[in-house]
C-alpha cells in the first residue's frame, strides 16, 4: 500500500449502495459518490457549482453490510480510500479502463445533519454473510455499568472526596 494513491472525497451518494456477495460469501457494496466543488464568483457575488466529479466506490466485508444498512441515496458522506485502475472487456469486445475508489473508511457528513451511531456486534467473523440484528433496548440493563446513575454519592461512595 506504500505506492497507492489515497483520496478523501466529500459528496453525495447518487443511489442506494448495492450489496452483493462473492461465491465465497464475502460482502461487497458498490456505490457512486458525486462531489461538486463550489466556486465563488467575485463579479456576481454568488456561489456557483463547478463541474461534478462522479467516483465509483466499493467496500468489502462487514463494512459493506454496514454501509448498505446505514446509507441511502442523497446521503452526504466522507469517503477515504485508494484509487484503483481496473481494465475489463465489454460484451462487444471493447477494452475499457475505469478508475474506482477502494474504500477504507466511510461515514456520514455531520456538517448539515446529525447521526446516531450504533456499534455493530461481531458474530461470525469476516465473510460470514450474516447480518446480526442490532441489540437496542430502551431500559438500562443490570450488566451495563453506564446504563444508570450511581447509587449514591458523586464518586460512587458516600463521601464527597474523590477516591484518589
Swiss-Prot record:
The keyword Signal does not apply. Binds single-stranded (ss)DNA. At low concentrations (0.02 to 0.16 uM), stimulates the 5'-3' helicase activity of DnaB. At higher concentrtions eventually totally inhibits DnaB helicase. Changing residue 21 to L: No longer stimulates DnaB helicase activity. Residues 1-110 form the SSB domain. One of its GO terms (molecular function) is single-stranded DNA binding. GO terms for biological process: DNA damage response; DNA replication; response to antibiotic. Homotetramer. Interacts with DnaB. Residues 120-164 are annotated as: Disordered. The gene is ssb. It comes from Mycobacterium tuberculosis (strain ATCC 25618 / H37Rv). This is Single-stranded DNA-binding protein. One of its GO terms (cellular component) is plasma membrane. HAMAP family: SSB. Keywords: DNA-binding.
